[in-house]
């Protein structure tokens, strides 16, 4: 070997075989699941997620999401007897200790999908404090009590489906007759709500329309409408039914953006000159007040857009959430709210600097059933 060759090899060794520095003790070794071991057979969901935490990529984020949810559920503060009157707000467990107020947000397509049953489980068992969804998240829950949604294909042609009166949501199909049944069901309820509103106004005077401090008054808000629909449907398969039964508010700031908006629009003609009113401002006061009164606040956001921002902005009123789990497929390069990572919300004061937060980049229907199985439904009581 010539001196020149030795020089070249020396340079290459410096570049290619550069020595690593000391490995920090905090580093975790990447490991997967060894299915040849007996304890990997018929694993519990919680054990599966625990094993996935060291896989890397979104598997690790999934494990982190479960840890954060477990922590927000397990947190306990002072007993109510230790608090002054002003501090006796927020959420408390059955023993009277402060617990996290958990805001659950989900987009309408998730109710259209089979994830509805998972979401209903959380509400049925009082595992969340408040819900934010879109109009479809309200109406599709009711519609599924009236008629089924079917599996289809992503590739089905829109023109052919239109001829058959079939509406496609991804690879789901909703017959248009379902919406006709929804109209038949909801119109008498809207009529009754309008009659109650007008009777109240006649009794109290028109000035009562500007005041909405009485929770039981028929000056309607989107959350009161959702509660009424849950009461009227009286079906245990419904998310709204259990929200009504357990007094969990369902906020829908975009209540008119869907079939229910169509029903409200048509009702303005049927009921004219009387008009059913929905007070959005009363609802923003209600959700923001819930956030401000929370001892600890957690966000579980399934999807993006309005439902994500509405909860995050409510948490701004308390200088940020203490826990945040985002699950969606959005990317941040387009500046969208859906794509934004939790750290962007930190810059706005919507998540605390010291908060536990993670974003899982995944289809919610793929990973959230696993998360619920490993946390809310793992048999451990929080």
Swiss-Prot record:
Which cofactor(s) are needed, names only?
NAD(+)
Q: Give coiled-coil spans as residue ranges.
A: none
Keyword hit for Oxidoreductase: no
Which InterPro entries does the UniProt record give? Answer: Deoxyhypusine_synthase, Deoxyhypusine_synthase_sf, DHS-like_NAD/FAD-binding_dom
Q: Which residues bind spermidine?
A: 139-140, 262, 309, 335-337, 344-350
GO MF annotation: an example: deoxyhypusine synthase activity
Q: What are the annotated GO cellular component locations?
A: cytoplasm
Which catalytic residues are annotated? Answer: 350
Q: Which domain of life is it from?
A: Eukaryota
Please give the pathway this protein is involved in.
Protein modification; eIF5A hypusination
GO annotation, biological process: spermidine metabolic process
Q: What is its EC number?
A: 2.5.1.46
Sorted alphabetically, the keyword list is: Hypusine biosynthesis, NAD, Transferase
Q: Where does NAD(+) bind?
A: 108-112, 134-136, 140, 257, 304, 329-330, 363-364
Enzymatic reactions? [eIF5A protein]-L-lysine + spermidine = [eIF5A protein]-deoxyhypusine + propane-1,3-diamine
In terms of Pfam families, this protein maps to: DS
Protein family (similarity comment): Belongs to the deoxyhypusine synthase family.
Which purpose does this protein serve, as stated in its record?
A: Catalyzes the NAD-dependent oxidative cleavage of spermidine and the subsequent transfer of the butylamine moiety of spermidine to the epsilon-amino group of a specific lysine residue of the eIF-5A precursor protein to form the intermediate deoxyhypusine residue.
Protein's UniProt name: Deoxyhypusine synthase
Taxonomic lineage per UniProt? Eukaryota, Fungi, Dikarya, Ascomycota, Saccharomycotina
Q: Which gene encodes it?
A: DYS1
């Amino acid at each position: 070997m010539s001196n020149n060759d030795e020089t070249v090899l020396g340079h290459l060794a410096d570049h290619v075989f550069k020595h690593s520095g000391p490995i920090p003790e905090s580093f975790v070794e990447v490991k997967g699941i060894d299915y040849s071991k007996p304890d990997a057979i018929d694993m519990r969901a919680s054990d599966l997620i625990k094993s996935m935490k060291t896989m890397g990529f979104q598997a690790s984020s999934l494990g982190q999401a479960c840890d954060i949810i477990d922590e927000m559920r397990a947190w306990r503060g002072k007993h109510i007897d230790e608090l002054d009157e002003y501090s006796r707000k927020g959420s408390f467990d059955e023993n009277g200790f402060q617990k996290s107020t958990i805001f659950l947000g989900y987009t309408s397509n998730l109710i259209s999908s089979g994830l509805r049953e998972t979401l209903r489980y959380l509400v049925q068992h009082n595992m969340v404090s408040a819900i934010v969804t879109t109009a479809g998240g309200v109406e599709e829950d009711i519609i599924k009590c009236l008629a089924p949604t079917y599996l289809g294909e992503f590739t089905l042609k829109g023109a052919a489906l239109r001829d058959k009166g079939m509406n496609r949501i991804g690879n789901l199909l909703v017959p248009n007759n379902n919406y006709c049944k929804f109209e038949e069901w909801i119109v008498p309820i809207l009529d009754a709500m309008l009659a109650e509103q007008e009777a109240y106004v006649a009794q109290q005077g028109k000035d009562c329309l500007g005041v909405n401090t009485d929770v039981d008054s028929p000056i309607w808000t989107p959350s009161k409408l959702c509660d009424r629909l849950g009461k009227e449907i009286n079906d245990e398969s419904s998310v709204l039914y259990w929200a009504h039964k357990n007094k969990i508010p369902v906020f829908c700031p975009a209540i008119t953006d869907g079939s229910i908006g169509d029903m409200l629009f048509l009702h303005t003609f049927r009921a004219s000159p009387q008009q059913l009113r929905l007070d959005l401002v009363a609802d923003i006061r209600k959700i923001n007040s819930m956030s401000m009164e929370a001892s600890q606040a957690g966000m579980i956001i399934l999807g993006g857009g309005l439902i994500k921002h509405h909860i995050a902005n409510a948490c701004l009123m308390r200088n940020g959430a203490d826990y945040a789990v985002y699950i969606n497929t959005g990317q941040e390069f387009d500046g969208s709210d859906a794509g934004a990572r939790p750290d962007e919300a930190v810059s706005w004061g919507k998540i605390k600097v010291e908060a536990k937060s993670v974003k899982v980049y995944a289809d919610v229907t793929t990973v959230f059933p696993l998360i619920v199985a490993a946390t809310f439904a793992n048999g451990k009581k929080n």
